[in-house]
Amino acid sequence: MSRIESLTRARIDRSKEQATKTREKEKMKEAKDARYTNGHLFTTISVSGMTMCYACNKSITAKEALICPTCNVTIHNRCKDTLANCTKVKQKQQKAALLRNNTALQSVSLRSKTTTRERPTSAIYPSDSFRQSLLGSRRGLSSLSLAKSVSTTNIAGHFNDESPLGLRQILSQSTDSLNMRNRTLSVESLIDEGVEVFYNELMSDFEMDEKDFEADSWSLAVDSSFLQQHKKEVMKKQDVIYELIQTELHHVRTLKIMTRLFRTGMLEELQMEPEVVQGLFPCVDELSDIHTRFLNQLLERRRQALCPGSTRNFVIHRLGDLLISQFSGSNAEQMRKTYSEFCSRHTKALKLYKELYARDKRFQQFIRKMTRSAVLKRHGVQECILLVTQRITKYPVLINRILQNSHGVEEEYQDLASALGLVKELLSNVDQDVHELEKEARLQEIYNRMDPRAQTPVPGKGPFGRDELLRRKLIHEGCLLWKTATGRFKDVLLLLMTDVLVFLQEKDQKYIFTSLDKPSVVSLQNLIVRDIANQAKGMFLISSGPPEMYEVHAASRDDRTTWIRVIQQSVRLCPSREDFPLIETEDKAYLRRIKTKLQQKNQALVELLQKNVELFAEMVHFQALKAGFVGMPPPALPRGLFRLESFESLRGERLLKDALREVEGLKDLLLGPCVDLPMTSREPALPLDSDSGSCPGVTANGEARTFNGSIELCRADSDSSQKDRNGNQLRSPQEEVLQPLINLYGLLHGLQAVVVQQERLMEALFPEGPERWEKLSRANSRDGEAGRAAVASVTPEKQATELALLQRQHTLLQEELRRCQRLGEERATEAGSLEARLRESEQARALLEREAEEIRRQLAALGQNEPLPAEAPWARRPLDPRRRSLPAGDALYLSFNPPQPSRGHDRLDLPVTVRSLHRPFDDREAQELGSPEDRLQDSSDPDTGSEEEVSSRLSPPHSPRDFTRMQDIPEETESRDGEPTASES
């Protein structure tokens, strides 16, 4: 056993030693790799917190850092891979290469370490295009060969064909060693020696303006004597205007740096992909054009405001018109589109820049050398992107400050106020567009991360796939906790979309639909959101189809409040299922896309027609000016013809009437108001002139007189000026014709747009219209036989379609007939029931009349002191149907007994319950009315009066409320003094 233990112990020791040696080798290898990186000989040193890293320009907070004694560079340990090659090692390699060729090329001057680096012109500017642009393309190997030939001439002078071949080979090798170096070295030298020159060339258009705006404010830019002539309010206003122009100039400079320095260098010098560069600098060309045009307008206004004989002193009194022009109309729409695109991609651009800077050494050194120049100080890529993003937010502040100091001129104040409103509206629209674009990008990101096969069943609708997400807009999204039926919480990603709520889970870095006990897609139709009373972060989602209740919890109380608010807003704006189905099939999606494209094409066609009208008006106006009508104003273009959103745009009848009215006006101008145009089926014949016997504007041979390709309008004595009775200058016939002609042209094109829109609408509504396709095939066929063949080919299909339509109509008519028959039967049954009810009511009426007659006889007998029968006929009176329907008084009504006459008394006694209730009333009534005999003697018509009085006294209460009050009163069994009860009598 001791031997086995010793062998085991020895084996363990050997494994430990081997592991220790392996770790030491790995450490030595890592140290060696760390020491020799890109030619640097790094050593580990201890530094203080104030030492800056050469690679990332950040302080070195770690205790240990790396330093290269060759080039004296101190960096982080993690930044060693991003550092460029060691410059000293490069210089040694270059010097060794030159020394090897020194025996064959004595004219080559060596570079020393202490002297300034000098390179041949071809090495600095390797191509002709780069002489014009600092960062031009090298054009591959052809540029290298060109650089090689030029450098050969520069180094060795002029050699003829008789020069030794070996010498030419040595020259070739030496020039190759100069030109085929690392590309990064070329970039360094190019940028070091040409950034300032190229920047000056770039800003040459605004060189004088930059000098004029070098001062910090207008008060410092103008002369002191000129400054003292103005009030304090004027000085403040001019300072703000000066700041506006100065910052606009700086903004244009920033855009030019982005476009002409950074972007051009990345494309041509670094040979980066255009898509990558476009991702870094989106829409910079459009932004540069917009702000350059605005800056030129501001500078022109400044030049107009200069004092005579001075290039510095100026006072700008009017600026509101320029601001309104810049922030309204097409300019505002262009700014909205470009800034929305740029600001929405701002985050992606910065992320892409950081990724490129971290992984690409050439890109890193390019940026570092570019920003090292004095002219590009504080103008790196990140700073430029941020400055462009923030520029549009500066306009409201500047215009508001100008407005506060412009109380003198009312018109200028109104213009500035309008401009301020336009700028705020533009900024709000840009914010909204940026928010929508960010939501679209986020939705696309979620869509890309979802499993392509992910689906979830929707009860009664079918499977809901990830393609359904792209049909909708993302309104809000966030991570929530879903409480399951078992009481456990699940992390879910909740998407609030146009008409649904979608629950997603993350699995293997992909999103899938939640597979829990409830559907993961909830419709917003009739959705109810309620917060949980005892929980600050929880809320209930109660859906109606299918009826389910979800309990979810947000991260905080504010987050829950935000969710409740946006969900309630979305529920109110949720579209109906007829307009927006929950799940769309492929056919419906295809039709929807086709309809969307059709609408876009219609819009493009309408815009082309509108542009056509504008060009026609411009052409006619130019011809009129060329004909000698110098003072003629440009004609007014017809507005509202091509606006698809207006209700009047689709009124073709109105357009036709307007066009006919314009034609009538032209006829009156050309032929006179008393001449009527005969309307024929083919060609309208013009009436003959009474003097010449020919048509106006028509020669003897029937040809129209033309001038410069247009019909010559007849005018009377055009040379002499025409005036009215008041001496006012009259408009010539050409001027009178010009505006109606423009109106007619615009109306006809508007009518064409209406026809196109209506045809597209009919195609969308009735895709199977055979007659229309037949007409179109006839109209579009160039050959008659081909047209007839097309019609013949469509005939069977037409017949089949017509047969199907007739069958469908027959089926619909049969269904309508059956429905009418059922309706007639129902009406007959209802009429029979009404007749039965009428007969019953007549029988009840006859019975009531007989009872009333019997009561009259009894009352007459009562008046003669005749005793009533024990059972009066009206005691057997059936219950009134209306009384049966009373819910609370049925029992009381059934227990009601009519009064019985008591012998020996001159009054009627009521039952106990009713007497006790109406006792005060009975006493008062007895005193007023007296005995029945007195009433019979005083009454002229005993039947009529007694019946009404007795019925009013003896009838039961008229409403359920009276019965309720009667039931609430306890029954009294005591009778009055000297009055026997009903039972005793």
Swiss-Prot record:
Region annotation Disordered: where it falls in the sequence: 1-32, 890-909, 918-985
Residue stretches of biased makeup (Acidic residues): 940-949
Keywords: Acetylation, Cell cycle, Cell division, Cell junction, Coiled coil, Cytoplasm, Cytoplasmic vesicle, Cytoskeleton, Developmental protein, Differentiation, Golgi apparatus, Guanine-nucleotide releasing factor, Immunity, Innate immunity, Metal-binding, Microtubule, Mitosis, Neurogenesis, Phosphoprotein, Proto-oncogene, Tight junction, Zinc, Zinc-finger
Coiled-coil regions listed: 591-619, 797-866
UniProt keyword annotation of Cytoplasm present: yes
Molecular function, one GO term: small GTPase binding
Region Interaction with DYNLT1, residue ranges: 131-161
Domain (PH) ranges: 473-572
CDD domains noted in UniProt: C1_ARHGEF2, PH_ARHGEF2, RhoGEF
Basic and acidic residues compositional bias, start-end: 919-938
Phenotype of null mutants: Mice show reduced volume of the total brain, the cerebellum and the brainstem. Show complete lack of precerebellar pontin gray and reticulotegmental nuclei. Show impaired precerebellar neuron migration.
Domain named DH: residues: 236-433
Post-translation changes: Phosphorylation of Ser-885 by PAK1 induces binding to protein YWHAZ, promoting its relocation to microtubules and the inhibition of its activity. Phosphorylated by AURKA and CDK1 during mitosis, which negatively regulates its activity. Phosphorylation by MAPK1 or MAPK3 increases nucleotide exchange activity. Phosphorylation by PAK4 releases GEF-H1 from the microtubules. Phosphorylated on serine, threonine and tyrosine residues in a RIPK2-dependent manner.
Record-linked PROSITE patterns: DH_2 (PS50010), PH_DOMAIN (PS50003), ZF_DAG_PE_1 (PS00479), ZF_DAG_PE_2 (PS50081)
Name of the protein in its database record: Rho guanine nucleotide exchange factor 2
Species of provenance: Mus musculus (Mouse)
